[in-house]
């Protein structure tokens, strides 16, 4: 399982490895369940990262549109 400081990209690669091993190997049930659990935890972390990024993008977009409108209003006067 990746550490908390790993990047989004490294977590995606780790998730891909887990999925690949589960698709291509005959794993004992215990190992398959461990891989599944690790994959679900990674998905949750990745989802949280994406949601946080989406929130930042929305905030920046809204602020940018407001600033753009203000700048446009000052040119019209």
From Swiss-Prot:
GO terms for cellular component: cytosol; exodeoxyribonuclease VII complex. It catalyses: Exonucleolytic cleavage in either 5'- to 3'- or 3'- to 5'-direction to yield nucleoside 5'-phosphates. It is found in: Cytoplasm. InterPro entries: Exonuc_VII_S, Exonuc_VII_ssu_sf. Its EC number is 3.1.11.6. Keywords: Cytoplasm, Exonuclease, Hydrolase, Nuclease. GO terms for biological process: DNA catabolic process. It holds the Pfam family Exonuc_VII_S. GO terms for molecular function: exodeoxyribonuclease VII activity. It comes from the Bacteria. It is an enzyme of class 3 (hydrolase). Belongs to the XseB family. Heterooligomer composed of large and small subunits. Bidirectionally degrades single-stranded DNA into large acid-insoluble oligonucleotides, which are then degraded further into small acid-soluble oligonucleotides. This is Exodeoxyribonuclease 7 small subunit. It comes from Clostridium acetobutylicum (strain ATCC 824 / DSM 792 / JCM 1419 / IAM 19013 / LMG 5710 / NBRC 13948 / NRRL B-527 / VKM B-1787 / 2291 / W). The gene is xseB.
